[in-house]
Amino acid sequence: MKISTIFKYIFIVFAIGIIIYGGYKIYKNNNQEEEQENDSQTVAQEEIIQDIRLAVTNYDTINPILTNNKEILNIDTLIFEPLFTFSSDYILTPCLAKECSKTGDNTYVIKVNNSVNWQDGTSFMSKDVAFTIDVIKQSNSIYKYNVEHITNVEVVDASTLKLTLDGNVPFFEYNLTFPILSSNYYLGEDFFTSSKTPIGTGRYKISSINSNSITLSKNENWRNPEAEEIKLDNIKINLYTSMGEAFNSFKIGNVDVLNTTNTNFGEYIGTIGFNKVEYAGREFDFLALNCNDVILKDKAVRQALGYAIDKDTIVSSVYNNQKFVSQYPLDYGNYLYTSENVSSGYNAEQAKKVLEDGGWTYRNGHWKKEIDGSYRTLRLNIAVNKDQERRVQASEKIKEQLKDIGIEVTINKITNDQYSKYISNKDYQILYTGVYNSFTPDLTYYFSSGNIENYYNEEMQELINNSAIIKDSKQQKEIFQKIYTLYKEDVPFIGICRNKNITITSQSLYGNIEPSNYTTYNKAELWYRK
């Protein structure tokens, strides 16, 4: 055998050996990586804690119709469900209802989802809705406003009911967001004195109630098998006598989620070791401008006021940044008001220019204009409830800001009785006032006939009427944008600020925390602890 042939065989054997060894190393490495991945997944699974701890102060009852506790109402959204619910940006979506049709000026027909079961296994039916409306009407429930216009409820069949109203109610469907309770569950007993633990149709059910806590557990029979896998198995609601006690419990790690309107919460829990989400509430403060007033009927004056008032300074100096700057009734996160619109609008020089363009002349320290054959000096009066100290201070700040551009302002501090009469009679020039915005996007209070500012614009009236009729979301957004654009042109009122809500969470809590005024617990079933 030739030497070259021997070397060739040796080389082949050597090459095969290298290939076999390489394959072995790859196999071994893959096995090690797979074992490590399995180990890490096991560890990660072990680290996930599938329960959270909440806090409630001044507990009264878990019954959603009878409770007056705001946080209980918040938590009850996990247990009980309405006909319609809200997304985190306040889009109305079906829940227990399949559809709602307006069949006449004052009548609605609702189809309910009969595939839903109560947490005791019985079927949800339209008679449960009728029962709930009836007990709300008999009670002093916080939901009484939702049903006050319903004059008759007819159960057509197990999946259909017909509601008759006392008149035309814009956006009535938005009132159908109250929790529904089972009629059979309370059959033969007094709902208002029942000692039964309420049942719902939601993702969680009440497992136990004692003097110190309430425990919720996952509803294994919840109707939507296609929903994302629920990570959260149990929720413990700790009951406290005061917010100070709840803050302290959060601080030492016994509470994972705490809702508060107290912007000074850092005094109780410190400034580190937690996460927070601040979001705009529904308490809207604004200046109502009487559009029938001889001065304020001039649109240029109203526009100038909108530019001349520095809301950022008011919120920082008067409210110590405990509120959000606000300019519009829907700027609490409603999808019909886009974030691009958000601006305090302050521009003192533009305010002066608007007055000049509107025919006002500044001389001898005053703005003057001929109106109805007489020369008028631009002097304004702001009426404010004297018991509302912060509003009085804000009015004084506005007075200073308007003085800087040559507008004289007098502050009229009025009593509660005077304030009520001013509202009823619209007997004011400018009124510093406020409202609690509902979840409905209805803007009739500000723009329709009989509104608080004596404002009338035929185009606006048509837009407001159409806004309640159009159901297509794209068209609806277009209409609300036109309403906002016209508002900016006419300025019948000037938004100042709105309250600030805060959700505080422990750093061990994971998941998307997206609180809204409807509920803190949007997609809470996907939360977990580590």
Model-predicted segments: where are they?
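Gly/Pro-rich hinge or "lid" segments in bacterial periplasmic/extracellular proteins
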Residues: 70, 91, 176-230, 234-236, ...
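Append "and occasionally in soluble cytosolic enzymes with long acidic Gly/Pro-rich linkers
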Residues: 297-399, 482
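N-terminal lobe/hinge region of extracytoplasmic solute-binding protein
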Residues: 55-104, 134, 199
